[in-house]
Amino acid sequence: MAKLTVKDVDLKGKKVLVRVDFNVPLKDGVITNDNRITAALPTIKYIIEQGGRAILFSHLGRVKEEADKEGKSLAPVAADLAAKLGQDVVFPGVTRGSKLEEAINALEDGQVLLVENTRFEDVDGKKESKNDEELGKYWASLGDGIFVNDAFGTAHRAHASNVGISANVEKAVAGFLLENEIAYIQEAVETPERPFVAILGGSKVSDKIGVIENLLEKADKVLIGGGMTYTFYKAQGIEIGNSLVEEDKLDVAKDLLEKSNGKLILPVDSKEANAFAGYTEVRDTEGEAVSEGFLGLDIGPKSIAEFDQALTGAKTVVWNGPMGVFENPDFQAGTIGVMDAIVKQPGVKSIIGGGDSAAAAINLGRADKFSWISTGGGASMELLEGKVLPGLAALTEK
């Protein structure tokens, strides 16, 4: 990566501004999944071990008006982080003002402070989300000229707490998590060890058009599963029953198939049910066609076998999107089958592009078998699409 990283700067005695991604799920004030906090620990620990004073920024959820602040404070995150670090985390509970400034100025080397939810600034004219110039300058002024961006999950957004601060400091550098995310995903797409197989699932073709186009150029094979299968089926005149379809994307699907040169591999059968919820019948289709009155909710056993075959010998695999409605045990087999086919390949570099696929790997007990699981759904999608991420572009060149 041609950008400066946290290891390239002297941190001792410095007030170091750090953008982390602590956008964790909360239920009644309790964190239900702390993966993102854990993922940020190496960078935070490095800064404090080097004698820096870490000033952390993160958003949590969406905040548009005063009422939205309810339940969106980072206070539970501060407590969880303190427990993980084994030291106090200063939490002034504000995003600006004398209370924050005094707390920052009182920090000693090796101490950590967490600023309140950056999106609280969105109540006043979306200042965080619209990268308000004054806000970026103000936050930048709280440190000593060094900004560490370790929030891959928001790297595809130009906000005051990433791009805004970057523009107003002497050195904007990547943290370890951001560095790893870029290394794994970008290298997989740009300089993969071959054969390189991409697997794309999920419900909508519209979400993945750019990704499919980019990966058709880069990968040796692109396997398609999930609900978007049926838009590709209908585009070819295959019966899809009541399956999900994007009527306005049929031409796009047809075009992708025509220009794929046989690289695009679709399922050959489905697991169908007579309703999405409250169904009374679940069965495998004979071939591609879905029965009248039924809808496809997972890829079928023949497809699992075909995908297993297509993955044989793969050295690089990027997977984004489940093969079916994996939250329901009746429609998990496709996602499990594909995961198992990926991880059994000898010497494979296997990467999950965040979002639902990451949730599937974690919930179905396969997470530790993958080389890398991305922490950013939208950001990893844009990298897979070949886009430049604003949060990354704003960092200082080496």
Curated annotation (Swiss-Prot):
Substrate binds at residues 21-23, 36, 59-62, 119, 157. It comes from the Bacteria. Keywords: ATP-binding, Cytoplasm, Glycolysis, Kinase, Nucleotide-binding, Transferase. Monomer. Its main location: cytoplasm. ATP binds at residues 208, 296, 327, 354-357. It is found in: Cytoplasm. The keyword Transferase applies. Its EC number is 2.7.2.3. It is an enzyme of class 2 (transferase). It comes from Streptococcus pyogenes serotype M1. SUPFAM superfamilies: Phosphoglycerate kinase. This is Phosphoglycerate kinase. Pathway: Carbohydrate degradation; glycolysis; pyruvate from D-glyceraldehyde 3-phosphate: step 2/5. GO terms for biological process: gluconeogenesis; glycolytic process. GO terms for cellular component: cytosol. Belongs to the phosphoglycerate kinase family. InterPro entries: Phosphoglycerate_kinase, Phosphoglycerate_kinase_CS, Phosphoglycerate_kinase_N, Phosphoglycerate_kinase_sf. GO terms for molecular function: ADP binding; ATP binding; phosphoglycerate kinase activity. It catalyses: (2R)-3-phosphoglycerate + ATP = (2R)-3-phospho-glyceroyl phosphate + ADP.
